[in-house]
Amino acid sequence: MLLSSLISLALLSSQVVADPAWAPPDKGLKPEVARLLPPFLRYRRPIYAIAHRVVTVGGIKDAISHGANAFEVDMCADSIGEGWWANHDCTNGRKAGDSARKIFETFAAERKRGKTVTFVWLDFKNPDACVKNQGCSIEAIQQLCRDILEKQGIRVLYGFYKAEDSRAFKTIRNNLNDREAISLNGATTKVLKLFEGTAPKVSKHQRVMDYGDTYLDKGFGDCTEKDWYTCTELRQGADLRRKGKLGKVFAWTSTVNQGRLVDQLLGKAHVDGIIYGFKLTDYYDHADSRAAANDIISWVKRRRALYYMATNDNNPWIDIHKLFLYLLSWFSCILLLMMNEWTCPQDGA
């Protein structure tokens, strides 16, 4: 019995390297190096197809049916109606999308039905529009995330575009839990400097860099330049991720007929995921949105030995080192049991 337990735990520990749900995202090995390893030493890296401008219940269901496993939602605080709305262009009194509550409840219901909803990326358009005690405050939207999304196991990414000095950013920064992360937009050196200067206490695995352009081919480059070009900046961000200075790196926005750029982003820049969809339109079912999703999904399928589409089993903000130490403590526990000792961890990882 003890021997079988020991073997089982050893196999579980090996999953930190071999199994998708436990695999470190990219801690030191590039795909071209991993290919040289025997299969039992390889790990596969999870990839995220992030649907762009999902602001309606219908958009959520369409994106899920297209294979999206993560979702970018534009969020506007409505100081007149005292709430948050999914809306790209913030204008009080005009609601382009559904309420945040309705959006969140739909995501939670879809996840409960077994659909893949790994994380929801909130892109705040006017994060400081309301003060603390209003229903449209940053505190209110964070609590709504925790009450609805996170209770169903859905992770949250708070996105701040040129809002690092906002009260909202500071509030989120000071109140992150392990199901949440922060994304900052910009070139690699800028993002790293911002995290180290304005959010030094935010764990590295909860630091996300995003970079791109509405017109992705504009200034894209070939991934080998010194700086500035989209692909190069993202590749340098992935280098920081491998060094443990960032948790994830995401690109935006791929659209129809941009499979070549998707190939560069995933294959050369080694990003963790790509926002895809329409350039300037909210998400809905269309041949172009389906094609943009398929560019990412088919790329991963063709390289399934090294990559896979992230599932609900993945925690994108996981601290892999903490997990490894927890498994190691259980391994030690089994050894102590074999010597008639009893010292096993009581808390979860």
Swiss-Prot record:
Gene Ontology, cellular component aspect: extracellular region
Its EC number(s): 3.1.4.41
GO BP annotations, alphabetical order: lipid catabolic process
The UniProt record lists the keyword Lipid metabolism: yes
Chain span(s) of sequence motif SMD-tail: 310-317
One of the record's GO molecular function terms: sphingomyelin phosphodiesterase D activity
Location relative to the cell: Secreted
Catalytic activity field: a sphingomyelin + H2O = an N-acylsphing-4-enine 1-phosphate + choline + H(+)
Superkingdom of source: Eukaryota
Family, per entry: Belongs to the sphingomyelinase D/phospholipase D family.
Function, as annotated: Catalyzes the hydrolysis of sphingomyelin. Sphingomyelinases D are produced by some spider in their venoms, but also by arthropods such as ticks, or pathogenic bacteria and fungi. They might play a role in pathogenicity through different mechanisms, such as membrane destabilization and host cell penetration, but also pulmonary inflammation and cutaneous lesions.
Protein name: Sphingomyelinase D
Organism from which the protein derives: Uncinocarpus reesii (strain UAMH 1704)
Organism placement in taxonomy: Eukaryota, Fungi, Dikarya, Ascomycota, Pezizomycotina
